[in-house]
Each structure stands twice: as structure tokens, then as C-alpha cells.
Amino acid sequence: MEWKLEQSMREQALLKAQLTQLKESLKEVQLERDEYAEHLKGERARWQQRMRKMSQEVCSLKKEKKHDKYRVEKLERSLSKLKNQMAEPLPPEPPAVPSEVELQHLRKELERVAGALQAQVEYNQRISLLNEGQKERLREQEERLQEQQERLPEQEERLQQLAEPQNSFKELNNENKSVLQLEQQVKELQEKLGKERLEAASQQKQQLTAQLSLMALPGEGHGGEHLDSEGEEAPRPMPSVPEDLESREAMSGFMDHLEEKADLSELVEKEELGFFQYYRERCHQKVYHPITKPGGSAKDAAPGGGHHQAGPGQGGDEGEAAGAAGDGVAAGGDYKGHSKFLVTAQNPAHEPSPGAPAPQELGAAHKHGDLCEVSLTDSVEPVQGEAREGSPHDNPTAQPIVQDHQEHPGLGSNCCVPFFCWAWLPRRRR
């Protein structure tokens, strides 16, 4: 669960980084989109305004063209009338010579009409040229409008592409919410697991205190068989399935409870194995410590003659059993060294406490190869290394033991080797 939690936290950090990057890119894309949309709006407004002006100019030019056509037609009619009048032979009139004033007036009128006609023709030519230029401009504008219309779907696609990061942002938000929900579930599971561990630890502690109380009681009338029976592990009661579980939901809940109980028992066994290994290493260190002292010996470290190595005639299992017995005796000897300070704390005159077994009993138990109960208040002759230790206040190792003994005075009468040493010995025998 912790690995999943770390993985979810890493994924959450990566998602947050991606989310920030996407937010920044989304802001940039939105700014570009807004600028491009404003640019398009401005271009459209300008083109629409120009188209309106051009359409107004075209309408005015059309009106002027119609008016000019009407005037040209009128002048052409008048000119044709004048030509006809000039081409028709004059009726015979009485020989009367027209006056020069009338002739001059007619000539002036003819010149004026010809000049007006010429000016109208030139004006029409200019208008036609302007119309051609306007037509070319209109074609260009139509082509540009077509290009703009062709670009519109591309722009719409681009706007859709710009809107895609927003959708991805929403998806990331949903993923982030799911990750937060998963993290909350993991926290709830961790809290539940912690509560179950505490409950299992409390139950285990109660069982261990019960075992310690049973082991603290002296064995009566059974000898080596009683010690062997106490050294072996008690079989665990198998969980019984209740008979009233008929529904599937109740059965599934019961099976889940059994699985959780099995997981917790495995965790407790792992912790016990680690603690056993630590205690064994500590026992070995305390066995080797008095040997390395000047004047110390292996007999002082392991009273009762414990052998750690199997002889040439022994098998592998016998060697292991002998090594286990030697380790147990070493642990008992170490605790005997500490019991001296307990005796000095309670009995200043080094009087043996009542109910303590003799050293011969320890030797006999070691010969059997099975140590079930070793008293910490045995009267053991101090070796040269222990003689230099003095009072419990001079030894920092013994001070917490004496303090614990003073805080719990009930343990002084029959202090035993802890239960985990005897739980470890049957494993060594197997």
C-alpha cells in the first residue's frame, strides 16, 4: 500500500506539472486565438466597409452611365435631325439671301453641338475606362473573398484544435480528482490497517503476557517432558466458520475477515522472526564478550558445558540442536550475570532468593538439550571479568534492569528467559 501511495503521489506530481504546463499553453493559445479572432473581425469589417463603398460607387456610376446614355441619345437625335435638315434640299423659296447673322448663328450652334458631342464621347470613354478598372477591382475583391471563404474552414479547424487543450485540461482535472479520491481511499485503508495492526498487537500482547505468566510459574513433577512440552509452540486455533452464515454477503465478509487476519498474522510472524534474529545476534555478542576478557573462558560464558559445534559422530540435526542448546545456555548465562545486580538490589548480603533452582538443575537441563526456564536470580560464582563490575550503579547495562525490577517487584521471585528465546529453539531443532 505504501508503494502504491508513493506511486500515486509521483503520478499526482507529474500530473500537476503537466497541468501547469497545459494551463500555460492554454493561456498562450487562448491569447493567440483572441488576437487572431480580433484580427479577423477587423479584416472583415474593413472589407465589408470597402465593399459597401465600392457598391455605392458602382451604383452611382451606373446611374451616371444611364444619364450619359440618355444625353448621348438625345444629342445623336438632334444631330441626326440637323444632318437631315442639312441634307434635305431647301424648298424653293423666293430668292432671298439669308442674312449673314443667321448663318453665323447656325455655324456657332453647329460648332457648339459638335464640341458638346466630342466632349460627351470623351467623357464616355473615360467612364468606360473607369468601369473597366472597377470591374477588375471587383474581380480581385471577389477572388479575395473566395480565398477568405476557403480559409474559413481551416480557421475553424484551427479554432477547434485550440479548443482541444481545454478538453484535455478538463480530462486532467477529472484524472486529478480520481487520483485525490484514490489517495483518500489509500489513507482510509492505511488508517484501517493501522487500527487492525493495533488490535492484533494488543491481542498478541495479551497472549504473550499470558504465556509469560505461564512460563513464570515453576514446573511441578514432570521433569524433562514438561520442559519439552513448554518449549514447543502451541498450535493456533483454526477459525471456525459460524453456522448462521447463509447469505453470500455474510460469507464474503467472513472470508475477507479471515484474509485480513491471515495477513496480520503473517506481518506479526515477520516481526517476530526479525526480533528473534536480533536477539540471537545479541546473545552471541554477549557470549563472545566474556571470552575476550582477560581471565574469561567459554565455560564462564556458557555454564553447563554447551557445545556449539557438532562432533564427528553427530548428524546435521544433532549439530543444530546442540548449537541451539548452546545459544540458549549463553542467553541464560548472560541473564545470570544480570541477575547478580537484581540480587544486590533486593538482598544486599547476596542471599539466594527463595524458589531459585540450583546450578545443577541448569546443567541437567543443558545435558537434555532443552532449556525451557532459567531463573535470573541463580546464585552463580562471579568470574574474574564480573568481579570487576562492582555494584549495579557502576554498570550502565544493569541500571535499566534494576530500574525495571524496582518498578515491577513481582518479577524478582521468578524471572525467566523471555518467551521469544524458547519460540526460536524449536525452529532450530526442526
UniProtKB/Swiss-Prot annotation:
GO cellular component: cis-Golgi network; Golgi cis cisterna; Golgi cisterna membrane
UniProt biased composition (Gly residues): 303-316
Span list, region Disordered: 138-158, 217-239, 290-331, 382-406
Coiled coil, from the record: 2-217
Record field: transmembrane: none
Disulfide-bonded cysteines: none
UniProt biased composition (Basic and acidic residues): 222-235
Protein's UniProt keywords contain Coiled coil: yes
Alphabetical UniProt keywords: Coiled coil
GO biological process assignments: Golgi organization
InterPro entries according to UniProt: GM130_C (IPR043937), GOLGA_cons_dom (IPR043976), Golgin_A (IPR024858)
Pfam family, one: GOLGA2L5
PANTHER family: GOLGIN SUBFAMILY A MEMBER 8C-RELATED, GOLGIN SUBFAMILY A MEMBER-RELATED
Family statement drawn from the similarity comment of this UniProt entry: Belongs to the GOLGA8 family.
Name of the protein this chain belongs to: Putative golgin subfamily A member 8D
Record gene name: GOLGA8DP
